[in-house]
From Swiss-Prot:
Organism: Bordetella bronchiseptica (strain ATCC BAA-588 / NCTC 13252 / RB50) (Alcaligenes bronchisepticus)
Phylogenetic placement of the source organism: Bacteria, Pseudomonadati, Pseudomonadota, Betaproteobacteria, Burkholderiales
GO molecular function terms noted in the UniProt entry: dihydroorotate dehydrogenase (quinone) activity
Gene symbol of the encoding locus: pyrD
InterPro entries, sorted: Aldolase_TIM (IPR013785), DHO_dehydrogenase (IPR050074), Dihydroorotate_DH_1_2 (IPR012135), Dihydroorotate_DH_2 (IPR005719), Dihydroorotate_DH_cat (IPR005720), Dihydroorotate_DH_CS (IPR001295)
Pfam families, sorted: DHO_dh (PF01180)
Compartment(s) of residence: Cell membrane
Residues the record marks as active site: S183
Designated name of the protein: Dihydroorotate dehydrogenase (quinone)
Subunit structure: Monomer.
Family that this chain belongs to: Belongs to the dihydroorotate dehydrogenase family. Type 2 subfamily.
């Protein structure tokens, strides 16, 4: 365990000298190699006991991997064995697509932040499912979330068609499914968070889920991932709509378009969503507002700007039942997983 944890701080300067997306790919490849050699397989069982329940699912611990780090589901086992209680992969679209032109990911180290405009680059649903089927994570007791989106060239008026295809495709292989309607990098996607649009989409997804549950003889929870840049009225509308359509969870939040916290820094004016430290307070506001409106009707997963165990605890105190990590892993490395698990285990005593 110590070898891996000490290796990342040593490797970080070399990784940060690379283009951010290249470094991301190199890190995943090296992590996969470490897993294949057996170097990470003890980490999963080295975490303290912190069992939790989320959307009716039993978790080893309430610290998860956020979608986006493994878009094609090619590294589920390697990532899960870093000690996560659950892993979410994607976003996957029905058809493969290249995403936006490169460069499309930028570090802002002084702010512990990233800007990305990746644009749902992925290999498509068939390749995604094949990768998921090869994974041993679920057979080892891990919880797997599969995150679905729409293709960039699908008109927003027909977005539901893509989500219905995605839901049907991933349903047999998922412990839960996340509907991503909050990426700022797919044109007009965030419009689906609006009251009428959201209600129409979720109504169709719930109808399809009921049919799939009957077909596969199992209920798979549905979660919706929302943006941090919502007004109080928009949050309230979402909180009213989710339980009406039987939605089990809400993931708060995706990246922000706000630039206040990074103004004047190199790359700050690049188009795309900001993740990392600047999102922490924004997501806390959304989580607190959702919890005050939802009560216990819908589970909340807190994500955005967690770079310490203390910040994971703050997400839970705001009303989340679980948390997810992404950008914090880039700045802190895999040691962050255990730090968050320990903090939440202590907080639950």
């Amino acid at each position: 365990m110590s070898i891996l944890f000490h290796a990342y701080p040593l490797a970080r300067p070399a990784l940060f000298a690379m283009d951010a997306e290249t470094a991301h790919e190199v890190t995943l490849a090296q992590l996969q190699r470490a897993y294949d050699c057996g170097l990470t397989r003890k980490l999963l069982h080295a975490q303290p006991e912190a069992p939790a329940t989320l959307m009716g699912l039993s978790l080893r611990n309430p610290v998860g991997l956020a979608a986006g780090l493994d878009k094609n589901g090619a590294h589920i086992d390697a990532l899960g064995n870093l000690g996560f209680g659950f892993v979410e992969v994607g976003t996957v679209t029905p058809r493969a697509q290249p995403g936006n032109p490169k460069p499309r990911m930028f570090r802002l180290p002084r702010a512990n932040a990233l800007i990305n405009r990746l644009g749902f680059n992925n290999q498509g649903l068939d390749a995604f499912i094949a990768n998921v089927q090869r994974s041993q994570w679920r057979s080892q007791g891990g919880i797997l979330g599969l995150n679905i989106g729409k293709n960039a060239d699908t008109p927003i008026e027909r977005a539901a068609e893509d989500y219905l295809i995605g839901l049907a495709g991933v349903y047999p292989h998922a412990d839960y499914v996340t509907v991503n309607i909050s990426s700022p990098n797919t044109k007009n996607l965030r419009a689906l968070q609006g009251g009428d649009e959201l209600s129409a989409l979720l109504g169709q997804l719930q109808e399809r889920r009921l049919a799939l549950a009957d077909q596969h003889q199992r209920h798979v929870p549905l979660a919706v991932k929302i943006a941090p840049d919502l007004s109080d009225d928009q949050i309230d509308a979402i909180a009213e709509i989710l339980p009406r359509h039987g939605i089990d969870g809400v993931i708060a939040t995706n990246t922000t378009l706000a630039r206040d916290a990074v103004q004047g820094l190199p790359h700050a004016e690049e188009a795309g969503g900001v993740s990392g430290a600047p999102v922490h307070e924004l997501s806390l506001r959304v989580i607190e507002r959702l919890r005050s409106r939802l009560g216990d009707a819908v589970a909340i997963i807190g994500v955005g700007g967690i770079l310490s165990g203390r910040q994971a605890s703050e997400k839970m105190a705001a009303g989340a039942q679980a948390v997810q990590l992404y950008t914090g892993l880039i700045y802190r490395g895999p040691a962050l997983v255990g730090e968050c698990v320990r903090a939440l285990a202590q907080g639950s005593r």
